[in-house]
Amino acid sequence: MATLFLTILLATVLFLILRIFSHRRNRSHNNRLPPGPNPWPIIGNLPHMGTKPHRTLSAMVTTYGPILHLRLGFVDVVVAASKSVAEQFLKIHDANFASRPPNSGAKHMAYNYQDLVFAPYGHRWRLLRKISSVHLFSAKALEDFKHVRQEEVGTLTRELVRVGTKPVNLGQLVNMCVVNALGREMIGRRLFGADADHKADEFRSMVTEMMALAGVFNIGDFVPSLDWLDLQGVAGKMKRLHKRFDAFLSSILKEHEMNGQDQKHTDMLSTLISLKGTDLDGDGGSLTDTEIKALLLNMFTAGTDTSASTVDWAIAELIRHPDIMVKAQEELDIVVGRDRPVNESDIAQLPYLQAVIKENFRLHPPTPLSLPHIASESCEINGYHIPKGSTLLTNIWAIARDPDQWSDPLAFKPERFLPGGEKSGVDVKGSDFELIPFGAGRRICAGLSLGLRTIQFLTATLVQGFDWELAGGVTPEKLNMEESYGLTLQRAVPLVVHPKPRLAPNVYGLGSG
């Protein structure tokens, strides 16, 4: 124990010495750093973050303004908390902030930065991004898997009809639907249900463990001199999980390769396998097995909880605002009718539903703080010096509630996005910086198109197909809307409801009615 304490003490002293020299070398810039709360010795501003850092950082804007400087351990962190500041970082200086800072999760679980989400900005990242855009998330690719999403959403609606008067945890059922759809699109397997095999069970449990580990604060990421000690055992758990995950993905990859032409382009993995050995960039660049596995890992971890939690929040908001629910249902009844279920191609003709979903993204972004970026070089933003190596966080949640951008920012008002509304031309695809739930710039979410389709289609289906009543006699105005902070912004209390079918049984695929 004494040896461990001495090691920590020596490592800390060494870092303090290095920081003193760094301070002297850069002292001409220090008075130009963005403002922020005074850091504590060693741990910096970590104690200031609290359990809901997006809210804590938003509150700091009142005191320090829309660009903040923090010290988390020994890491310089800059927070963008307004539309104009975010645009400076992610548009004007986008190239300088196109890489990610080092972190234990990417190192130990995401194939040592060989994935798309955490890969350094450069040639290999551009190649992976091109593969994703052209082969996985293009309009054609999304259309090819449209039937999968329709089938899984149909399964969900039939289950909701069959529950009768029993209450259901809506978020849980929606999550199962999204996981099954993505599992079939990715690897040709459902992960929930009677036809899910033992490999699917294993995969699902590993994803759950990975999401939990990725949300753990690892002190080694912020005090690098302590990283090798793995004081919390986080790195060890990540390494063991990665070993299991890699074995699973390797077996699935081998199975697909053995099936050869029989499985060509039947799922995303077979598409990726077909690209192996192909010159993808005109310079001999091809896709490796490791990169294929890393891409699968990215798609599954990024695409499940985010979509499911967003739909869960949307239905909760509509239950709280029955007048808005009625308007959305009336639009669906007029455009689609009650004789068939809504499908993805109908969404373009449902402007009010689209406005509801935009407003839901505004108040409940799936990731309230962006994934971190790193400054490749020092630069100046709004007159402040941003040191090389600084970590950038964009407070997506705070920007979307900024009273300088939004009238009545805490109210749920889809009309603001309709023609004549204050934000009628605003979209969620990264060009309007007051609303960037998928991020912006070069590192915008690669799966934006699939995620948006999934969320729109699921929400439309649940609105068209059912009226909703809260369980336990809870009234809409008493519905708990507290959030639980993590990798995604989940509801703190599950949304437990009674679904009441509003269409004929045959529309749900349950026979003539």
Swiss-Prot record:
Enzyme superclass (EC): oxidoreductase
Regions crossing the membrane: 1-21
Catalysis: reaction(s): a 3'-unsubstituted flavone + reduced [NADPH--hemoprotein reductase] + O2 = a 3'-hydroxyflavone + oxidized [NADPH--hemoprotein reductase] + H2O + H(+)
Keywords annotated in UniProt: Endoplasmic reticulum, Flavonoid biosynthesis, Heme, Iron, Membrane, Metal-binding, Monooxygenase, NADP, Oxidoreductase, Transmembrane, Transmembrane helix
Entries under SUPFAM superfamilies matching the protein: Cytochrome P450
Cytoplasmic topological intervals: 22-513
Tissue expression from the record: High expression in siliques and to a lower extent in stems, flowers and senescing leaves.
Membrane topology (UniProt): Single-pass type III membrane protein
GO cellular component, one term: endoplasmic reticulum membrane
Binding positions for heme per the UniProt entry: C445
GO BP annotations, alphabetical order: flavonoid biosynthetic process; response to auxin
EC number, as in UniProt: 1.14.14.82
Co-factor(s): heme
Classification via Pfam families: p450
Keyword Oxidoreductase: yes
Subcellular location: Endoplasmic reticulum membrane
Molecular function via GO: flavonoid 3'-monooxygenase activity; heme binding; iron ion binding
Pathway: Secondary metabolite biosynthesis; flavonoid biosynthesis
Stated induction or repression of this protein's expression: By UV light treatment.
Additional information: May act as a membrane anchor for localization of other, soluble, flavonoid enzymes to the endoplasmic reticulum.
Similarity comment text for this entry: Belongs to the cytochrome P450 family.
Role summary: Catalyzes the 3'-hydroxylation of the flavonoid B-ring to the 3',4'-hydroxylated state. Convert naringenin to eriodictyol and dihydrokaempferol to dihydroquercetin.
PANTHER family with a match to the protein in the record: CYTOCHROME P450 98A9, FLAVONOID 3'-MONOOXYGENASE
Protein name (record): Flavonoid 3'-monooxygenase
